């Protein structure tokens, strides 16, 4: 089963818009110029999907096939630079949008793996790569340890979303739209709970004794 084109497009636009704005804000916190802001926004929004497509041999890359998405991301980045205080005050909204973006990208990653007849493990891996690697690249370019590696249950949500989506659409053979909506609801709800209650994985701290 495949998600219909309209659903894919809608989800993708939501995802890249949210991630583009969060990327722009991250660049602003590090006092980057306009080129830096736009570049970080682009990397955040389409970096994970690009890595996934290269690894899976899925061509052309989505933004190459639809360059209008680049324009949309640039626009969202510019909007974020004009109203940073408004965006910051709407923290709850953007945390929600970020959660939606994470789960949306995870669903799309899993679906592309499914379209290529890959199994469960590759579908979940594609979900994680699509969902979190844009943020990893963003943090590396901003010269900080990626948040996904140290504080938050972020990759875990991508794993859960990919696993749920694959299970529903392949093993239970439910309608694609139903699978998408269920995965989106569960994934976003879990992510927001993790933020509210500050859930995190155990931290490994090692100090070498001299």
Swiss-Prot record:
Places the protein is found: Cell membrane
Predominant localisation class: membrane
InterPro entries: Gly_transporter
Keywords: Cell membrane, Membrane, Transmembrane, Transmembrane helix
Highest taxon of the lineage: Bacteria
Entry annotated with the keyword Membrane: yes
Gene Ontology annotations for the cellular component aspect, listed alphabetically: plasma membrane
Transmembrane segments: 31-51, 60-80, 94-114, 117-137, 153-173, 175-195
Membrane topology: Multi-pass membrane protein
UniProt entry tagged with the keyword Transmembrane: yes
UniProt similarity note: Belongs to the UPF0126 family.
PANTHER family: INNER MEMBRANE PROTEIN, UPF0126 INNER MEMBRANE PROTEIN YADS-RELATED
Name the record gives this protein: UPF0126 membrane protein Cj0593c
Organism in which the protein naturally occurs: Campylobacter jejuni subsp. jejuni serotype O:2 (strain ATCC 700819 / NCTC 11168)
């Amino acid at each position: 089963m495949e998600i219909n084109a309209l659903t894919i497009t809608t989800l993708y636009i939501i995802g890249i818009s949210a991630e583009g704005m969060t990327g722009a804000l991250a660049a602003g916190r590090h006092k980057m110029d306009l080129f830096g802001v736009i570049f970080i926004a682009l990397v955040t929004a389409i970096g994970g999907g690009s890595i996934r497509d290269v690894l899976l041999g899925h061509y052309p890359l989505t933004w190459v096939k639809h360059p209008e998405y680049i324009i949309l991301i640039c626009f969202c980045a510019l909007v974020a630079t004009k109203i940073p205080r408004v965006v910051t005050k709407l923290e709850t909204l953007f945390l929600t949008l970020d959660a939606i973006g994470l789960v949306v990208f995870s669903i799309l990653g899993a679906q592309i793996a499914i379209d290529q007849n890959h199994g469960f493990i590759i579908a979940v891996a594609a979900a994680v790569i699509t969902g979190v690697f844009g943020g990893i690249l963003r943090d590396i370019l901003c010269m900080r340890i990626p948040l996904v590696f140290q504080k938050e249950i972020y990759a875990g949500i991508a794993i859960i979303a990919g696993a749920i989506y694959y299970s529903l659409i392949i093993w239970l053979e439910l309608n694609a739209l139903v699978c998408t909506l269920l995965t989106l609801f569960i994934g976003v709800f879990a992510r927001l709970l993790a933020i509210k209650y500050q859930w995190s994985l155990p931290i490994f701290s090692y100090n070498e004794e001299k």
